[in-house]
């Protein structure tokens, strides 16, 4: 059945793009799985494979994981009326669940997960993430909710017509 796991990226359901088929009913997934043996715990990884050192090279903003509920994309974002581009909004989530989290990546400090690091969970659950392979200089303040045009004063030979807050 195709309704047991939903994955959305920018309001697009990418669940059908997943390989390996759909999970059986009541299957225990690696994501969000807990073990009673502390030496065999599964860890949530964002941008890294579960085994080895396969890391992604990407920009990421507003990562939400809701445990136990299936919510619509409209709980997390909306389409901009002017540009037609999907943009994040404050999450409309009544309960994140025990293992749920919301990462806004507001802080630039790296290392062990805490409320003042890049992996701070702002859902209220305090499920902070430890960063690995990330430097303070990798953090950028140019995000979908904080975007500003930057002009290059050294490139005086170009002509431009600026509009929409100099973002176009």
Identify the residue ranges that each predicted region occupies.
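Localized edge beta-strand/strand-to-loop motifs within extracellular or lumenal beta-rich domains
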Residues: 1-6, 68
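Extracellular structured ligand-interaction cores
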Residues: 2-4, 43, 55-62, 98-100
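Glycine-centered positions in the ABC transporter ATPase nucleotide-binding domain
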Residues: 11-12
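Extended recognition patches within non-cytosolic domains
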Residues: 16-27, 59-126, 130-146
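Extracellular beta-rich ligand/substrate-recognition surface
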Residues: 19, 51, 167-168
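Extracellular glycan-interaction patches encoded by glycine-rich segments
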Residues: 30-60
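A general structural signal for short secondary-structure junctions and capping/turn motifs
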Residues: 36-37, 53-57, 89-97, 104, ...
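Short carbohydrate-recognition loop motifs
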Residues: 158-168
